[in-house]
Amino acid sequence: MTIILAIETSCDETAVAIVNNNLVLSSVVSSQIDLHRLYGGVVPEMASRQHLETINFCLEKAWQETGLNWSEIDGIAATVAPGLVGALMVGMTAAKTLAIVHDKPFIGIHHLEGHIYASYLAESDLKPPFLSLLVSGGHTSLIHVQACGKYQQLGTTRDDAAGEAFDKVARLLNLSYPGGPIIDRMAKDGNPQAFPLPEGKISLPTGGFHAYDSSFSGLKTAVLRLVEKFEPDNLPVADIAASFQDTVARSLTRRTINCALDYGLKTIAIGGGVAANSALRNHLETAAKNHHLTVYFPPLKLCTDNAAMIARAAVDHYDLGHFSDLSIGVRSRLPLSEVMQLYK
């Protein structure tokens, strides 16, 4: 059994967790949503300062919940890429300090690999190879998971990430930040077939369209044009929200199912904040069942950023002897296919 303490500060959640293999011993998340809502999105400098103010509290709370001794901790992990540089620095510095003081190996973790491993916490039988759909405010990717540290990107977004599109459309509808949960709630009272909207396709130079890549900028523009047709007091917010959400869900579902079938992958695992979206869950579950595929969604609390998923990824890296040098820095960008650069 491997016990890891992990820290996640890549964006606007300060999170600390302690995990024993698939068992979450403690998980503390301090969200900054109320702070950034005033500005309609994450302000990087403010996020970094808030991490500095809350990291010690989160560490103390997570530690007290376990009753462990430091001798029982095998390694210390932190998200080091990708993300906001200042925010990442807070978590990485705290983790390195603990690693030095308590003489533990340090394990730098890729944020997207953490989202993949969120499904491992919920499904102990999940084993590679499988297809991972990662959908969040910063990423929309189809990943062929071959092994711990071995990933092949099969599809991505060419412009806005899915979660980013939700936030932008929410602003068009005069809804608050973050847009994803609010649009999901509003859509429950709307008609998803009220307004036909374009899915967004990527043309190939040789003709036809890219099978797995997504585009959401055209969809966002279509919603803008639709909104402009109505007087502000008569805007059918619920119907527009439902139509937009259904279009995104259908687009992601079609690409994901086609990718899984083309690559002969029988299992699909979903990760990232948009994995909490009810329409996406319904569309994917129905389509997977129709094609005799298995689809896993992590619990809602593991869809958004948390440190338990980072710790679970670190468990496998620890068991494989993948440790990071203490001289390693943070990176705002790092392809998941290059994750092994983080280790000695």
Swiss-Prot record:
GO terms for cellular component: cytoplasm. GO terms for biological process: tRNA threonylcarbamoyladenosine modification. GO terms for molecular function: iron ion binding; N(6)-L-threonylcarbamoyladenine synthase activity. Fe cation binds at H111, H115, D305. Its EC number is 2.3.1.234. Disulfide bonds: none annotated. InterPro entries: ATPase_NBD, Gcp-like_dom, KAE1/TsaD, Peptidase_M22_CS, TsaD. Binds 1 Fe(2+) ion per subunit. The keyword Endoplasmic reticulum does not apply. It is found in: Cytoplasm. It comes from the Bacteria. It is an enzyme of class 2 (transferase). It catalyses: L-threonylcarbamoyladenylate + adenosine(37) in tRNA = N(6)-L-threonylcarbamoyladenosine(37) in tRNA + AMP + H(+). Required for the formation of a threonylcarbamoyl group on adenosine at position 37 (t(6)A37) in tRNAs that read codons beginning with adenine. Is involved in the transfer of the threonylcarbamoyl moiety of threonylcarbamoyl-AMP (TC-AMP) to the N6 group of A37, together with TsaE and TsaB. TsaD likely plays a direct catalytic role in this reaction. This is tRNA N6-adenosine threonylcarbamoyltransferase.
